[in-house]
Structure formats: structure tokens, C-alpha cells
Amino acid sequence: MIAHKYKLIEKINEGSFGTIFKAENIRTKEMVAIKFENKSEQMKSLKNEARIYQYLGNLNGFPQLKTFGTTGNVNYLVMDLLGNSLVNIIKHKELSSNIVLVLGIQIIQRIQSLHNNCLLHRDIKPSNFVFGNKDNTNKLFLIDLGFAKRYDYNGKHIEQKNINHIVGSLNFVSINVHNYIEPSRRDDIESCIYVILTMLFGDLEWFKETDINKIALLKRNIINDDKIPIFIKKMLNYIRSIEFDATPDYDYIISLMIQ
């Protein structure tokens, strides 16, 4: 029993980040998701994620935090139980071009909402966009905020600097992050564009590559690929052109998907 009221039902997912279970509130019968993470100095992403969910409150398109705590040698986070991720949909090739555009707009809207709250996600990938349950089955939610970070402190944008290691999933990080430049809002957007490309085409050319430099080169050159839609090329050209501390023109990016 977790927090004296949550009964574990079944494991949903497991990875280097920890484990996620479906659970039931034995008092209200509400179904929830519980994330577990080994408690150590090296693993503090779950506490960071809980803090950010609490900060975001009832922000549209983000799960609600129920509680955060510790039991034994693990931290746990209780949150809304949501549905399948984009990975499941992409795997079964169930997305028409029109559906991709509808979902693409939601993806940009979610990251805009996060940015409007002075936060970067820094780990954008298909598995971090999930559909809602019940009345929200067509609505995307943005999850896994363990790597999220503030980019603005009291109206002052963080400074551009070099980083020691790549932050995020290698298949989806931006060209700037490949160059070991601190991520900013532009880089979240570039990662979102790669997610949209994955919805359109499935595995991208660089997904089977292991050489970091080759992956970066393939990403850079994708705008020269005749198969890539014009709106994607325009989005990439735009987001790769703006400065580190620039506010992306979200309306322009969305407009490219509704022309």
C-alpha cells in the first residue's frame, strides 16, 4: 500500500528512469499512475518532476500531481492515469496526414504552455506525449518532466553556454544540443518537429545510427530530402535560425500546419 491508500494493480512501464504502475485509490476507486525511482543522490528527477507538476497546477494538457513521497529506498510520484503514448500509435501506423497535423498542433501548443511558464522540457520524444482517458482520448498530454528546467529567472533569460553531455534522447535532440550548446526554447521546438516527422514516416533515417556526428549530419541535411513536406522544412529552417534566447513564434509554426 502506497501513502496508505494506493493499491498497486499492474506494471505499466519500466526503464532506466524507474518503474510505473497502475494503481487504485482504495477509498475513492480512482485509478492512478505511480512512478517509482530509487532514492539516491544521483536520482533526483522524480522529485524535480513532482515539484514542476505542483508548480504547473491545473495547466491544460499536463497530468495532475496527487502526491509525492518516499517508501523504503524509493521515491514515488502519484499522478493521473493516462492512455497510450504516441509510440503505440506510430508503431501500428494508424496516423493519416490530417491526424498528424492535428496532433502536431497539440504538440506545439503543449510545449508553448510549458514555455509560457518559464520552463524547458529538454527531453521531447514520442513516448512523452500520451493520450488522455475517458473524455480526453483525442487529447495529448505532455509528461516526464524530470529533466525540465527554468530558462527565465525574474525576467532574465539563462545565458548560452556549453554543456558536457547531451541532454535528452539522441534521436530527437536538436542540432545545437549535438554541438553541446545549452538547450533553450528553440531546441524543444526542434525536437517537437522530429516527433512530427516520426508520426509521418515512422523510424527516421538516423534511428539506426550509433555515431553521434552521423546522426547530427543526417538531421542537418533532412531539409534537402524531397520526401519531407514543405511545412516541415519551413519549420526547421525557422527554428534553426533564431537566437538562443529568442521567443519562438508559436503561432507561425502552427500556421504552417493549417495552411
Feature-to-residue mapping (PLM):
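Protein kinase glycine-rich loop
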Residues: I9-S16, I20
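ATP-binding glycine-rich loop module of kinase domains
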Residues: T19, N25-K47
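Structural motif at the C-terminus of the N-lobe alphaC helix and the adjacent alphaC-beta4 loop
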Residues: R51-N60
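Short beta-strand micro-motifs within the conserved protein kinase catalytic domain, predominantly
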Residues: Q64-N75
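Structural motif in protein kinase domains
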Residues: L82-K91
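Activation segment signature within eukaryotic-like protein kinase domains
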Residues: L103-G104
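Catalytic-loop of the protein kinase fold
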Residues: H115-G132
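Activation segment/activation loop of eukaryotic-type protein kinase catalytic domains
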Residues: G132-V167
